Amino acid sequence: MPYPHQTDKKEPGQKGGPVEILSPAGSLDILKCAFAAGADAVYAGGACFGARAFAQNFTEEELLEGIDYAHIHGKKLYLTVNTLVKEREFDQLYNYLLPFYRQGLDAVIVQDMGVMEFIREQFPHLPIHASTQMTVTNAISASFLEQKGVTRVVPAREISLGEIRQISDRTDLEIECFVHGALCYCYSGRCLMSSMIGGRSGNRGQCAQPCRLPWRAEHDRKERDFLSLKDLCAIDLIPDLVRAGITSFKIEGRMKQPSYVETVTAMYRKYTDLYDSLKEGKQDAFRVSAEDRRILMEAYQRRGYTDGYYTRHNGREMLSLNRPAQAQKKETAVKTGKEQPLQKKINGKLILSPGKSATLILSAALTGGHAEVTVTGDTVQEALSRPLSREQLQKQLQKTGNTEFAFQDLDIRTEGDIFLPLQSINALRRTGLEKLKDRITDSFRRTDDVQKVPCIPCSAPSKERPLGEIPLFVSAMSAEQAWAALSIPAVKRIYLSDTVWAQGGAQELLDKARSRQVEVYVSMAEIYRREAEDFYGKHLDAIARNFDGAIVKNLESFLLLKEKGFSKPVDTGASAYAWNRRACAFWRDLGADFTEAPLELNAQELGDLDRSRMILPVYGYFPVMVSAGCIRKHTKACTRKAGWTSVTDRYHKKFMVRSECLYCYNILYNPDPLVLFGQEKEIRALAPGALLCGFTWESGERTREVLEMFRKWHCGGQAPQWEEGFTRGHFKRGVK
C-alpha cells in the first residue's frame, strides 16, 4: 500500500515537474526560515562528511527534527556527504547515515564514487544526488551515473546552457544548478590549493579560500583578486535556465545568515513563480523589477555579481579584480514578510455529546493523499449552569501555539448544553496534534531491514619490494621531456600529453620508444568538455593506433574510450579520486589498469588500499587548480597560444600557470615540487605497482638531471640532496 505522500504527480525538482527552489540551511532555525520564504527543499550538513566543515551544521537530533519538519510541510531535506572518504571511515559513515535513512531522509549528495557505491549497497532506497564536486561536465558521465542509480546530478558550475540542455535531453535525471551565491575559481572537486598551502582540504570541507586573497600576475605589477570570482546572480536568466532543462535552482550559502537565506529564497521563489504564471508566447515579458534587484543585491555585498558561466566560457568581467575599499562582507536584513515559521493547515471536527467521550478528528492534506487521526478524551458532562459555547470551544482548540499546525477549518458539533473542563479540551487538542504529526512523519519512515555489508577486503597484502624492482613511469607535457625520459633505461612507461600529439611531430618519438620497448600512453585532458570532444572526435582513431594505452583524469574521458571501443589499457590519474577500496573497485570494474595514488592521503592511509596496481608519485609539480578562467586573458597578455605564465601569492611563492588553449582551461601548479627521494623505507613497505616522476615546465636538460638522480637512488644509491624548495606533500601528514 502506498504511503499517503506517494503520488504519480510530479513534485518540485522532478523532471517534468515545477522547478524546485533549493536553499541552504546551516541550522534548524535557518531551515524553518527557508521554508517560510518559499523553499521547496533545503540541503544541510551534519556533524561530519560535509563540504562545509566550519559551518554551524546540525546535530543528529536537529537533523532528525529537520527531516520531520520538512515532511510535515510537504518539503524535502537533502544531506551533504560531499567529501572524499578514507577507508577507515566507512564504519563511521554507516552509523552516521543509519538514523537519517530510517527517519526518511529525502536524498544524500555525494562526491566520492566509493561512497556512492557504499550507499547503493547499504541504503538501497536512499536517493543519491551527484555533487558538483564530481565535476560532471557532459551527458556521457551523467548518463553513466543514472545507470548507477543516481537520480539527480549537480553539474560543474562552469558548463553552459547548451551543455546542460544536452544532459537534460539525453537522460531522465533531475538537474540541479546553482543560481545564486559564491563561485569558485577552480572546477569544484579539482582544487588542492588550500590543502597544499595550509593542510585544509577542500575535498574534506575545510577550504581556507587562499584564492580570495590578492595575487600578482606575471604581466601585472598590481596585486589583484585574479583568482576570485564575483558572486553568482542568475535571476535574470530564469527563463533560459528553465528552457535548458534545469529542475532545481540551488542557492549557495550554508554559512550565511538567516536574513540572506530568507531574502534570496523569497526572490527566486517570486520570480520562478512569475515565469511559470506567464502564458505560452508571453514569457519574453519576464522582467525583474529594479527594487527587487536592489533588495537581492543588498542581501549580501562583498565581491559584486555576475551571471556566471551559463552564457560564456570565461571573462575578465567575472572577476572581482579591484577590491572595494570596504571589502568586508555585509549582509543586510530585508523584511519579506515571511519571517514566521510555517504552520500546516489542517481540518478538525470536534464531537461533544453528554455522557460520551469527547472526540476530535484531525486531517491534513498530503501530496497524493491525506492523513487522518481520531482521538478521544474525557467524558462530556451536561452543563448545570454555564454551557460551553461554540465560540469558546473554537477559541480553545485554535490555540495551536508553537506547533507545526494551524486550523484551516474547524467543525464543532454539540448535543444540548454541555460542559468540559478547559484542561480536558487542551489535552484533547495536544494529543490530537501529536498523533497527527506522528501519522504524517511515520509515513516517511523506512522500516526495511538494513544489514551492514562487510567492507571490501584488500587483495593479498603487498610484500615489501626492493626499490629497484618497482618500475618507473614518467609523465611528460613536452616532447623534449619525453625524449629525455627515453634516454634513461629505468623508464618503462611515458604518459605523453595529448597536446604534444596535437602539435604534430610525435611520431618519431613514438617509433623510438617502441624500438626501446618503452610504452607510451596518451595523457588525456584534465577536463572533458566540447573542446575535448571535438579533438578526440578527430584524433582518437590515430591515437589508438599509435599509443600503447591512455591515462585519464576524469570519468568522461574514460567513458569516451569505452564508448569508442578503445581496446588498450587505461590508467587513471590522481584526480580520478580513489581514496578507499570501494572507489578503487569502482575504477577497476570500469576497466582501469593502474591507478595513481591520491595526493592527499598519507603513507599509512595509502597502505589501506590495494597497491599492486597503484602508481605512487615521487617527483613533480602537481596541479592545485584547474580553471575555466584564463590568467593571460585576464591580464591582457593573451597570445591565443598555449604557454606558461605565473601568479605570485603574498608570501612571494610563484605558482606556474599553464594556459591550455586546446581545451580552453588553465592549470595552476604547486610552487614547490613533490620530492619523495629518501623515503625508501615507506615506499618499500607500500610496495606500489609503479613510481611516477611527473614533468611540467622543466626543460629537457632538467628532466634528464632529475631522472638521473632518481636512477641512482632507484638502484640503491644514496638519496640526492635536494637544494631547492620542495615538499613531501601529504605523504607524511595527510589531511584531516
For each feature predicted by the language model, list its residue ranges.
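Surface-exposed amphipathic alpha-helical tracts and adjacent flexible/coil segments at the periphery
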Residues: 2-37, 41-52, 64-67, 73-101, ...
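Glycine-rich, highly charged phosphate/nucleotide-binding loops
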Residues: 58-63
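Ser/Thr-centric signal marking residues that sit
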Residues: 131-135
